[in-house]
Amino acid sequence: MSDTSENSNAEIPADTSDVKDKPKPIVRAPQFPPPPEGISKSQWKKICRKKRFEETRAEYAQIRKEKRNRAKLARREKLKEYTDRGEEIPEELKRPPKVNLNQSDSGISIILDCSFDDLMNDREIVSLSTQVTRAYSSNKRENNYAKIKVTSFDKRLKQRFDNDLSNSNYTKWKNFEFTADPTLPTENAVYLTADTEEKLDTLEPGTTYIVGGIVDKNRHKNLCYNKAKELNIPTKRLPIGEFINLAGRKVLTTSHMVQLMLRYFDNKDWKEAFESVLPPRKLEVDSTKEDSETASAE
């Protein structure tokens, strides 16, 4: 009996099988209680999601803070390794200046069309506000800047900036304007959308490029394309497939769209702009196309 007891309490050896071969757990959609009488299911889901967002806001803020602190610590340790060895610090570890004092005017204007506020949940509004601030940072730091305007700035996105991001002083941002006016130009304007077949070969000074300010995880197909068609604004797409392969969706964030256009003016080379701006996890360079596509870009 004692042997049986000892065996039952013996330490079970750890599973040494390759964890990569194990299937990932299925992430199921959150379950909400039945909606009260008089409230539709979609309205009730929005209410529940908003409530859950408010309840977990502080927790997520703490998680993001800890993640930033870990990244800072890892960077400091990496820098120390180079300095201890007396080696030059690589460019990718150097922080870019907050303001580029040697900027040139690209000659283009960019509009962030933020008229899709009602189609996003609260988390997506937070994400969009982050993308807008990143677009502003790019406009300060890149070698070329654009005149950027945020339109339809009058709902939750504005509340986000006025309440949670009030320290940003966004009303004083240089070359960056916020307006509640939803009007979009129809002359010398191009609406950029991945849903069109027309390819954007070059950026032309004097032209306004409109970017849809929406975070929707691809829920709303042809949203920007249909709006542009209704307003008789020409549509074009960045030449992503012609120069690179993207891992996953060929839909870029609003901030990446802005940074790519600004970076394009460095050498007027889309391939170089894509490879220098997009994170490696999204980028899959097709080396078989390199020679022909480089020639076509010149």
From Swiss-Prot:
GO terms for biological process: tRNA N1-guanine methylation. Its main location: cytoplasm. Keywords: Cytoplasm, Methyltransferase, Nucleus, S-adenosyl-L-methionine, Transferase, tRNA processing. Residues 1-10 have a biased composition (Polar residues). Pfam families: tRNA_m1G_MT. S-adenosyl-L-methionine binds at L192, T193, G212, D216, K217, N218, R219, H220, C224, L238, K250, V251, L252. Coiled coil: none annotated. The active site is at D216. Transmembrane segments: none annotated. The keyword S-adenosyl-L-methionine applies. The keyword Magnesium does not apply. It catalyses: guanosine(9) in tRNA + S-adenosyl-L-methionine = N(1)-methylguanosine(9) in tRNA + S-adenosyl-L-homocysteine + H(+). One of its GO terms (molecular function) is tRNA binding. One of its GO terms (cellular component) is nucleus. Its EC number is 2.1.1.221. CDD domains: SPOUT_Trm10-like. InterPro entries: MT_TRM10-typ, MT_TRM10-typ_sf, TRM10/TRM10A, tRNA_m1G_MeTrfase_euk, tRNA_MeTrfase_TRMD/TRM10. Gene3D superfamilies: 3.40.1280.30. Belongs to the class IV-like SAM-binding methyltransferase superfamily. TRM10 family. Monomer. S-adenosyl-L-methionine-dependent guanine N(1)-methyltransferase that catalyzes the formation of N(1)-methylguanine at position 9 (m1G9) in cytoplasmic tRNA. PANTHER family: TRNA (GUANINE-9-) METHYLTRANSFERASE (PTHR13563), TRNA METHYLTRANSFERASE 10 HOMOLOG A (PTHR13563:SF13). This is tRNA (guanine(9)-N1)-methyltransferase. It comes from Kluyveromyces lactis (strain ATCC 8585 / CBS 2359 / DSM 70799 / NBRC 1267 / NRRL Y-1140 / WM37) (Yeast). The lineage of its organism: Eukaryota, Fungi, Dikarya, Ascomycota, Saccharomycotina.
